[in-house]
Amino acid sequence: GKSMLKDGQPDLTNADVKGAVEFIKEMYDAGVIAPGAFSMKEQDKVEEFTNGRVGMMIDSLAHVNTIRESNPDLHFSITAFPAEDGYTGERGLPYAAWGIGVAENSTHKAEAWKLVSFLMREDINAQLSSIANAFPGNSKSVPDFVTNDDLFAAAFEIYQSGYPANEFVGLPVAEDLMRSFDEQFQMMLEGDQTVDEMLANAQAAWVEQFK
């Protein structure tokens, strides 16, 4: 329910962002975050969880079956994204999105939009999400895995109770924004700067990209 933006502009120094960063640093300093987690590749993180070396991870549904196949004896569940104590509002659900668009210079715009409409149709979108083990883009679509698998059903219930949240979608040079934030974040974790300094430096870097 919180944001790194305000009126479409960077707002990294607000109290909510600071609180989240401080919480992560507290966990890092306490040694409860897997060593090297901030520089691991996605698959490395999944393997850490699959092999029982970490007790929790934030991940995609796409890996559920991979985890089951790699370690059939691992018993795990899915829960909503963590929130601060006392928070009662809707919870944002981080997601990786793929977009569909029609080029301005397309000679078949009408046909292209017809295809997009077909893919987003309730029944077709349900089929696509079932094949991909992912959440549908059409809010009325219900993928097959909801009725076939208790774990996926729990995940879908969480999805319906919250809202998709990815503040980097649609932002200018999103990868540069993530990289500049991570660079300052790593320096803060190593003790080279305070949380306030880290957020101020990241804010300055972001503002330059928004000009």
What are these regions (language model features)?
Residues E42, D59-V64, P82, A96-W98:
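Beta->alpha turn/N-cap motifs
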Residues M187-A200:
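Short, charged, surface-exposed loops that flank catalytic or proteolytic processing sites
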